[in-house]
């Protein structure tokens, strides 16, 4: 069983690298299940639209996770209630529309995969306690009982919080990855009890930028230049960044984790 997890898709350049590469990668690596974080996929890098989500599904994505930008496009409020494959962080207010986790079949209907979307509490917009939410979900998505495999996308700023969640799910989830900071970390590994982990899997976007945004305009904003405009995504060649987890069908835990970085400035 192979699961592909890709980092935040950033604006048009990020969508383009997905469109040009995802189907080929799924075939090349014999991927069974694909999860991407789509919360920056809109043209301005903030939020996601119905049409973009549906493009991702047609390109082979099984589940789209998100984070603090999930509500930036108003149309998504209605759509997320209708489309169970689009997740918002589970620890948003209880009354929030949509779901923060779900159970999905692989394309061949052979396996059930649990996908959990969480958002950090530190330096992020106010949410419910992420560990309390995680505790409740652990009682609902149980490896080798109601799912064959499970993965967690933890959308957060702080390395320590991400690492703590990784250890909290160690042995009870196939993999835990961090998103949000848009730069892939070098700590790709399998934890003590068998859970694949990486603090941040980066972004699918133009790295010749400031975390995906146009670098010239970003510098103007840092320098308080009156000519600076609102942030907008960089438009150069994008890098596709994520990981592939190879999992044991008997235990549901990770056997191997491989970093996947292709295209754009990170590979040149």
Where are these predicted regions, by residue range?
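Acidic, metal/ion-coordinating pockets
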Residues: 1-268
